Amino acid sequence: MYKAVIFDFFGVFCPDITLEWFKKTVQEYESKLADFQEICTRSDYGKLSRADFNKEVAALAGVSVGDLIAGVESETVINNSLVAYCKKLRAEGCAITCVSNGTHEWTLQVINDHGLGRLFDLVVLSGDLGIVKPNPEIYKYTLKKLGIKPSEAVFVDDREVNT
């Protein structure tokens, strides 16, 4: 058995909620996708606060910040089967860890708003470190914090490029 299972959050525990909202809300979103991704990249590197992220994405989408927040919250559906499985793994002594690209304030808000704060033994966020997956340094940092070797953990992500 592994000593730790390391999960991405968005796309694994719940959809990539802001992207899903953007696709549903913005007409001809493909023409604005590169700009959206550039905003997300700055946020993932910790160079953009969540408030500024919301302002920029709302402006790009042509909606109010309030509509953006409400829309994104409506996209947040937690994978409860995965949560139950993680609780089982923790009960068996396996550390449950989150490594995700995103800001501290936003990711922890989603985690805590959905009662998942105690699920994770460790949460590592790209915005805190300025290191974005798939950069190996974010995984090395996580393993060091856990005090384990790479062979003692498995990583689960919705994007193959990150594994």
What does each model-found stretch correspond to?
Residues 112-127:
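Structural recognition of alpha->loop->beta junctions
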